[in-house]
Amino acid sequence: PYDCKNVIFTGGEPMLNDLWPIARVLKRRGYHLSVESNGTVEVPDGLLDWICISPKDQMYPNVAIRQRTGDELKCVYVGQPLSLYDDLKDGFDHLFLQPCYDEAMSVEKNGRSFAITEDVVKNNPEWRLSLQTHKWMGIL
């Protein structure tokens, strides 16, 4: 048997699925349950141990973020002003900026994106740097 007791619901938008029957079973069996969502659907209280919201505001600027609290707010940085998140960030314990990685761009341009994001984080210490590791490794 596999001893892992952590389950992360992610991929596409997990909150569009009826996760609660399987989540209840897993919770009764002692699993730690997490979700990574774009925040457009509110997460019901009480069943999940960790909520990560990763808005897709740079791709869909007119879509409302309904989940306004959680453990982690994770934003891909493409040069947007951080004030964009002022009304959202106070509801989260951890704030992360990720440099935008684009497989169509050169290594140099992606490196510049990383350096710019790193500077923004250095100048805004409430935010921490995070990487889309799977993209940097070519596991898309």
Language-model segments: what does each one mean?
Residues 5-6, 15-140:
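Conserved AdoMet/S-adenosylmethionine-binding subsite of the radical SAM
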Residues 1-9:
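Glycine/small-residue-rich loop that forms an oxyanion/phosphate-binding "nest" at active or ligand-binding sites
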